[in-house]
Amino acid sequence: MYVVILAGGGGTRLWPVSRPDCPKPFLPLLGDETLLQRTVKRVAPLVAEGDLFCVTDRRYGQLVRDQAPDVRLIVEPSARNTAAAIALAAAVIERPEDEVMVVLPADHWIADEDTFRSVLSVAANRMAWGAFDIETPLVTLGIRPTTPSTDYGYLRPDTMRGSRLDGVPAYPLLGFEEKPTDARAKELINMPGVAWNAGMFAWQRGAIQAALEKYTPLPMLIGQATGSELALAGAYDRIQPISIDKAVMESAADDRRVVMGSLDVGWSDLGSWTALLAGLGGGEAGGASGRVVQRGETIEVGPDDLVVRPVDGRLVVESGSAVAAGTGGTIAADGVWAHLAGARSLAAEVHAMLDRVARQENRP
């Protein structure tokens, strides 16, 4: 078994903290370690030395080297979403066809790391070797939903055929659903076994290579170019950005080639200010919510709100009362802000997070 961590992305829903030059995986949002460092530490006990890899594009190669020097780095010429990143890893990491590749995002938060490792081990050592009459399936790990969220895609399992595999609930997967409407999310969360799609996978190297060859041109484009940086850059110029879900997993589920393992580990992708506030609050946002405000946008700011904005080249957090003083509560943003509604009780936590980020960015 070897683990491939995918690190990149603009993290635009967390601006102005997460920016293209230093996106979410490389920030210490919920402690002194960055999300990438926490991910590496979380999975390191499962693999031998030399079996932990990170795929990122050339903008972030040095950040990975600095933050995770023991991880073996695979650098993409440019960002082309997860399908290309996984295809590149499958091509360049030379392992036996039946060795299991685990794929994880670099920027997720997991509270119960022991249970996470246990489930991941079952996915790699049991599920990926065959289940529900599927030989060498593609395994995806689904998160037990806690709210009818419209921020995530959903996984629909065949609960009639599900069972526990080494203690982990597992099912053949019927299909994927894109981020739903409010009404559809409320329907989905009441369906047995339905899970959030978290982008975590386990599969034999040969299984994902065969699936990529069946559903995409990526192995042909990338496989012929891995020996030269120039050739690989040219191949990437011809690749359209597409997720592994769209490129492979949805079709594989239609062909009944996917198994879902169920995770209940206190998970968050920290993909929005609302999710980050919940993380800063120890798992509860206390009714607070947040969103990115664009330059020139007019917003209503209340006394229980916070605003994160750049002032004199640094990010500061200010109370709604201070920001909107003398305006009657209505103000136009003079840059990219974060408006954190009802977050006054989390002011100290937001201050501390901004201080950690500033120290990280100022390191030599």
Pin down the residues of each PLM region.
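Generic preference for hydrophobic
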Residues: 26, 73, 176, 259-260, ...
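Left-handed beta-helix
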Residues: 203-364
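Solvent-exposed alpha-helices and their adjacent loops that cap or buttress functional pockets
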Residues: 6, 45-47, 93-96, 102-103, ...
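Alpha-helical scaffold segments in soluble metabolic enzymes
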Residues: 25, 38, 42, 63, ...
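A short acidic, often aromatic-flanked loop/helix-cap motif at beta-alpha or helix-coil junctions
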Residues: 79-84, 147-149, 182-184, 267-268
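Residue-level signal for inorganic ion chemistry
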Residues: 36, 89, 107, 155, ...
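Conserved core of the sugar-phosphate nucleotidyltransferase
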Residues: 112-224, 229-234, 256-257, 325, ...
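Conserved N-terminal catalytic core of the sugar/cofactor nucleotidyltransferase
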Residues: 1-5, 13-16, 20-121, 127-130, ...
